[in-house]
Regions:
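Catalytic-core regions of core metabolic enzymes
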Residues: 1-640
Length: 640
């Protein structure tokens, strides 16, 4: 006969770790053809330089892609001096990557051709999918099913493309003509237009990128996949994200928490307001999450949140060039008082400390600074300070052990050679300590055009900003990230005495009886007891006499609170009366609550009152749970 066997599969830490490793390795292998292709087919390549297909081919050639290029166009024999092919099937050699810019109706055949020719990765530039409504979403679902059915991966649709600045690859598989300098930062953007702006800004600011991906509608490859690739990419030290939505927030949290332990992740989240969320939904067909949920997600996973793209770049420059601060003590060295005041204010507003230096350190500074200089911190060298004063001041402070980070504020007066000052800053920091170097950020002001000073500092990997608040903001966020990284991983405790099944039965019974809503006071007491959470004695009283009797039983002084499944904020309707010393006070409290509800025509909302003894000591807490449509259950926990 048949035998039925039931196996209980319990996840262990080791099992979960092995599963995550397999997922990571498989994801990295599947994304490699996007970033390290030996050959690229441009499907929809065109002789028209203004068309998307023409721009794609031009960008690949302008970047000097090191592999083979195959333009695909059924109506051309050659394009820009390259032999063209009528279809991907007609290409004589294997193509690792296909960049596709054809009308949506033509995509199914192109995907079949790519699969037949062994293409492993697709970048679909074409728009007209989930971002345009239900019909487009159905079209996107069919496209994704086809791509996955053939075992391929896809970036897009509705995207700008991607690039890799590795000198051995030099891939610009996008329709952006901008190829930024090579560097240690990788970025994923959910907006193609913002991607264009980011690439332009990166080139202007000399911000080196390792790779860039415009994910578009994220039908297949998402930021979650890219995080895993960049986690192991030796050319990537900092990860930048522009997010409008989270396809799978729990997976993002799991991956980001692990990656952020090794490499900083800086994210700008679009759609913070109702208007922004509506715009995000129509832009890439994505369900935008509530900002409170996003803030909690980033904070718990170590993701550094930037409020603007400008802030994203400011953080990126510092994280890519400087060590993380070991603490929150900041030393400010300046030649002007006003900027130092603004900087110090922003430091303290961001949770940083601007401590007064010790008498010993102040005496060392006084030995070479004029009597009018400020020595306490900020250190004001005054306007006449030269490069040597900056060098000596930084040497003393860096070696004092009284600062975890340095901010240098310089207002140009025209008399100081910019390059000499830049070198003095470098030398002062380097000669000040034999320990690990302190992070140093510079604000350089007062010049119409960028001079050799900021350029020299950038060459020395010392970030330069235009306004004094910016380095303070950057340090406050990098210090918070350093604190997060220093925290222990923690563990989930195993509670073996909880009767959670009883709690679930109580909740199901309440829903079956009355539908969705708030649990009654009696049911809530039972649920908390099932979870082994201690509850103060007392109970529900439906009448004034019951309330008086219950108060005698639990002992005075007592608290009387409205019991209601519909009134959530009891204090707003006078539903909480505290520190009642006798029976008469309890009766008056019952009447007061009842009469207030009657005055508001809400007497039917009163189920009675809860009577409990007053307690002292401990900490009053508030715990709440809500169900976010995207994130699932969210817990609010804090002071009551």
């Amino acid at each position: 006969g048949d035998m039925e066997v039931e196996l209980s599969l319990l996840s262990t830490a080791a099992g979960v770790e092995r599963s995550e490793l397999r997922e990571r390795l498989a994801t990295i292998a599947s994304l490699r053809p996007f970033f390290q292709p030996r050959s690229v087919a441009v499907v929809g390549a065109s002789r028209d330089p203004a068309s998307i297909g023409g721009r794609l081919l031009a960008a690949l050639r302008a970047a000097s892609f090191t592999g083979a290029l195959y333009p695909v166009n059924p109506n051309a024999q050659d394009i820009a001096g390259l032999r063209a092919y009528p279809s991907v099937r007609a290409i004589p050699d294997p193509a690792d990557l296909a960049v596709i810019a054809v009308p949506p109706h033509a995509l199914p055949v192109v995907v079949e051709d790519c699969a037949a020719r062994g293409v492993r990765a697709l970048v679909v530039i074409t728009a007209g999918f989930a971002e345009v409504g239900a019909e487009g979403r159905a079209r996107q679902d069919r496209l994704l099913a086809s791509v996955r059915g053939y075992g391929m991966r896809m970036v897009g649709p509705n995207c700008l493309g991607l690039l890799n600045t590795d000198p051995s690859v030099r891939l610009n598989a996008s329709f952006s003509p901008i190829f930024p300098p090579a560097g240690c930062m990788a970025m994923a953007s959910q907006s193609g237009a913002l991607g264009l702006a980011v690439l332009a800004a990166a080139k202007r600011l000399h911000l080196g990128l390792s790779t860039f991906v415009s994910v578009g509608n994220k039908a297949d490859v998402s930021s979650n996949d890219l995080l895993q690739y960049w986690e192991e990419d030796p050319r990537t030290d900092v990860i930048l994200l522009y997010q409008e939505s989270f396809g799978n927030p729990r997976r993002f949290a799991r991956i980001a928490r692990r990656v952020a332990r090794r490499k900083p992740i800086v994210a700008v989240k679009g759609g913070r307001t109702g208007a922004g969320r509506r715009a995000a939904g129509s832009h890439t067909a994505a369900l935008a999450a509530s900002d409170a949920a996003v803030e909690a997600l980033f904070r718990q996973t170590g993701v550094i949140r930037a409020d603007t793209l400008e802030e994203l770049f400011a953080l990126a420059v510092a994280l890519g060039a400087q060590p993380l601060p070991k603490g929150r003590r900041v030393a400010i060295v300046t030649n002007a008082g006003g900027p130092a005041i603004l900087c110090a204010d922003r430091c303290e507003a961001g949770g940083l400390l601007v401590p007064t230096f010790s008498e010993r350190t102040q005496a060392q500074l006084a030995s070479f600074l004029p009597p009018t200089a400020g020595l306490a911190n900020p250190v004001d060298l005054i306007a006449s300070a030269g490069a040597e004063e900056f060098r000596q001041a930084l040497r003393v402070i860096a070696g004092s052990g009284e600062a975890d980070a340095l901010i240098v504020l310089y207002v140009s007066a025209g008399a100081l050679d910019p390059q000499s000052l830049a070198l003095a800053i470098r030398d002062g920091i380097a000669s000040g300590t034999d320990q690990a170097p302190l992070p140093v950020l510079v604000c350089w002001m007062g010049e119409e055009e960028q001079t050799s000073g900021p350029n020299e500092l950038a060459r020395l990997n010392i970030p330069v900003y235009e306004f004094p608040e910016t380095p303070a903001l950057v340090l406050s966020k990098t210090a918070a990230y350093a604190d997060w990284r220093a925290q222990p991983l923690g563990m989930i405790p195993d509670f073996d005495d909880l009767d959670l099944e009883q709690a679930r039965r109580l909740c199901r019974r309440a829903v079956d009886a009355r539908g969705a809503g708030w649990l009654s006071a009696e049911a809530m007491r039972e649920v908390l007891t099932s979870a082994r959470l201690p509850v103060a004695p007392g109970g529900l009283a439906r009448t004034m006499d019951d309330a008086a009797s219950l108060a005698r039983r639990v002992g005075f002084p007592v608290a009387v609170k409205l019991a209601s499944r519909t009134v959530v904020h009891k204090t707003e309707v006078g539903g909480v009366v505290l520190n009642l010393q006798d029976v008469d006070a309890v009766r008056r409290a019952f009447a007061q609550i009842r009469d207030r509800l009657a005055l508001d025509n809400r007497l039917e909302a009163m189920d009675g009152v809860i009577v409990q003894p007053m307690v002292s000591g401990g900490v009053e807490l508030m715990v709440g749970v809500t169900h976010d449509p995207l994130f699932g259950p969210l817990i609010a926990f804090g002071l009551g």
